[in-house]
């Protein structure tokens, strides 16, 4: 599969750079990320339902990681490239370390 992302990740990019008052970078990073990841999954009610189950199932994930994991699992994406070791708690997802 090509590189993919979700609307949640794009929201996080905007949130982070807006919080830093770097709106110029918010737009630039957002656009570059969309170019790198041509597949963008929406976040649906099914995703938030699955994230709720992951969080309340005490699988060791934070809410944001659970949301990302739910979108991945619901779209049959099983590999993530990230620094975030929280994904190691999920047997269904393989984490490619960026470290």
Please give the residue ranges for each predicted region.
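PIN-domain endoribonuclease scaffold, especially VapC-family toxins
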Residues: 1-58, 73-74, 90, 94
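Conserved glycosyltransferase catalytic-site signature
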Residues: 7, 65-69
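A beta-strand edge to alpha-helix "cap/lid" segment located at domain peripheries
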Residues: 61-62
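Acidic, PIN/NYN-like endoribonuclease modules and their adjacent C-terminal/linker elements
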Residues: 69-99
């Amino acid at each position: 599969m090509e590189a993919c992302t979700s609307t949640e990740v794009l929201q996080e990019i905007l949130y982070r750079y807006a919080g830093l008052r770097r709106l110029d970078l918010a737009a630039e990073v957002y656009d570059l990320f969309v170019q790198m990841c041509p597949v963008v999954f929406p976040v649906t009610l099914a995703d938030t339902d699955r994230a709720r189950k992951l969080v309340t199932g005490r699988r060791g994930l934070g809410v944001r990681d659970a949301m990302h994991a739910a979108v991945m699992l619901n779209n049959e994406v099983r590999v993530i490239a990230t620094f975030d070791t929280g994904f190691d708690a999920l047997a269904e997802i393989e984490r490619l370390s960026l470290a």
